[in-house]
């Protein structure tokens, strides 16, 4: 089945939804998602969104991001992130986003690891869910935007290093989407790992297609492990994250001997490594995160999602310490893009976790992921707004069979598993089996 559209967006997380909303209303947009629209990492994000408080805070925000990233970031990208943060937060608010506020009506800012000041806006401990719902509801109002769920994109349509759309599979039917511009916003790699906070459907499909088409990628070894996922030996599903904002509000990390062993607000990689060492020293599979000294009413109001989830597993976090351990959480590497999110293939953009803007360096600063998705997806959309009238659609017929599609899907899977096995080396057993 052949479908013509102006802009094809692969993914329905913050980067996909926000790019769609940032395109002009006379542009026909088709969005594809592998499962349900809400089954994205954005929906799971807890802590919040970083933002420069004002012009004066921008240099400090840049410095914090560079320091957390071990100075392997692209500084100009970080400057863009800081400079354009507030305007995108304001746009979210105009769409109806409800951030937590102080009694005087001002935004309530919290602090997380490696931030010098409180600069993170949030919606209790379910910021990502509220961001998703805000953007998704706005998208549903736009007659120029169509979302197709439960469809697996398995290949890009290209010729002479120019992208003309993508091929996808739904209910054993092959769909060929011809577009003037294509945005890859397909998310990260957590579904490749046995233990991850990510949705299980996020299996590096965008990275696989980029590798198969010789599209430039960067820093594929930059994989972040979040220090504090709930330790639960009874489930093989995605691991439940205990937000960094819990430590930002005063939560303490303790060994199983109830001793503090690390500054809780150091960068994530530092805290995760400290926990690994403590677990090895004590021959334990977890350490404790303790918030029992906090007021119970504050805990249930500030962290309602975490409280309810832990309680459903028999753990009252107002009275008991939380067993936590590091698990795979975020992918800082990805498809190499310029400052407008353009890849090395013409008319193909990449935004969000699948992309490498250079913002994060070797270790992402807490709560910069949703912000990156906002800032650089808007830049992609604005670039398309200015260029789309000069682009002609190429309706190249792929003539793929179901057998071809299934073979390519298997090939994509093998490519990324083999790639990340070579990257992880001795830790390759953390990946799922092919």
Swiss-Prot record:
InterPro entries: FAD-dep_OxRdtase_2_FAD-bd, FAD/NAD-bd_sf, NadB, Succ_DH/fumarate_Rdtase_cat_sf
GO molecular function, one term: steroid dehydrogenase activity, acting on the CH-CH group of donors
Keyword terms of this UniProt record: Cytoplasm, FAD, Flavoprotein, Nucleotide-binding, Oxidoreductase, Pyridine nucleotide biosynthesis
Domain of life from the UniProt record: Bacteria
Enzyme class, broadest EC rank: oxidoreductase
Cofactor: FAD
GO cellular component term, pick one: cytoplasm
Active site: 268 (proton donor/acceptor)
Residues that hold FAD according to the record: 12-15, 34, 41-48, 205, 353, 369-370
Record EC number: 1.4.3.16
Reactions that this protein is recorded to catalyse: L-aspartate + O2 = iminosuccinate + H2O2
GO biological process, one term: 'de novo' NAD biosynthetic process from L-aspartate
Cofactor: binding comment: Binds 1 FAD per subunit.
Function (record text): Catalyzes the oxidation of L-aspartate to iminoaspartate, the first step in the de novo biosynthesis of NAD(+).
Protein family according to the UniProt entry: Belongs to the FAD-dependent oxidoreductase 2 family. NadB subfamily.
Protein name: L-aspartate oxidase
Species per Swiss-Prot/TrEMBL record: Clostridium acetobutylicum (strain ATCC 824 / DSM 792 / JCM 1419 / IAM 19013 / LMG 5710 / NBRC 13948 / NRRL B-527 / VKM B-1787 / 2291 / W)
């Amino acid at each position: 089945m052949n479908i013509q559209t102006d802009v094809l967006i692969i993914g329905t997380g913050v980067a996909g939804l926000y790019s769609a909303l940032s395109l002009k209303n006379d542009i026909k947009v088709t969005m594809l998602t592998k499962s349900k629209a809400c089954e994205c990492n954005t929906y799971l994000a807890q802590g919040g969104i970083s933002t420069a408080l004002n012009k004066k805070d921008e240099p400090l925000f840049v410095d914090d991001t560079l320091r957390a990233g071990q100075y392997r970031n692209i500084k100009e990208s970080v400057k863009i992130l800081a400079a354009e943060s507030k305007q995108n937060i304001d746009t979210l608010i105009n769409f109806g986003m409800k951030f937590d506020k102080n009694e005087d009506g001002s935004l309530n800012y919290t602090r997380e690891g490696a931030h010098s000041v409180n600069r993170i806006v949030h919606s209790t401990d379910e910021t990502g869910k509220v961001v998703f719902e805000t953007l998704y509801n706005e998208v549903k109002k736009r007659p120029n935007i169509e979302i197709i769920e439960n469809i697996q994109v398995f290949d890009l349509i290209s010729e002479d290093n120019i992208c003309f759309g993508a091929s996808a599979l739904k209910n054993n039917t092959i769909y060929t989407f011809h577009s003037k511009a294509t945005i890859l916003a397909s998310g990260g790699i957590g579904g490749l790992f046995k233990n991850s906070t990510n949705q299980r459907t996020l299996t590096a499909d965008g990275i696989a297609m980029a590798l198969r088409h010789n599209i430039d990628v960067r820093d594929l070894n930059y994989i972040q492990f979040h220090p504090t996922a709930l330790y639960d030996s009874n489930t093989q599903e995605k691991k439940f994250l205990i937000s960094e904002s819990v430590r930002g509000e005063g939560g303490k990390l303790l060994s199983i001997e109830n001793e503090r062993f690390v500054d809780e607000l150091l960068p994530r990689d530092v805290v995760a490594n400290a926990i690994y060492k403590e677990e090895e020293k004590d021959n334990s599979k977890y350490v404790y995160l303790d918030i029992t000294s906090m007021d119970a009413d504050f805990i249930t109001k500030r962290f309602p999602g975490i409280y309810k989830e832990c309680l459903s597993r028999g753990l009252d976090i107002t009275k008991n310490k939380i067993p936590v351990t590091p698990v795979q959480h975020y992918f800082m590497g990805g498809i190499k893009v310029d400052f407008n999110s353009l890849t090395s293939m013409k008319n193909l953009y990449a935004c969000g976790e699948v992309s490498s803007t250079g913002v994060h360096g070797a270790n992402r600063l807490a709560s910069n992921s949703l912000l990156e998705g906002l800032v650089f997806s808007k830049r992609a959309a604005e670039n398309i707004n200015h260029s789309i009238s000069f682009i002609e659609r190429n309706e190249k017929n792929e003539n793929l069979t179901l057998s071809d599609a299934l073979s390519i899907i298997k090939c994509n899977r093998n490519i990324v598993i083999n790639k990340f096995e070579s990257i992880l080396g001795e830790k390759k057993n953390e990946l799922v089996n092919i």
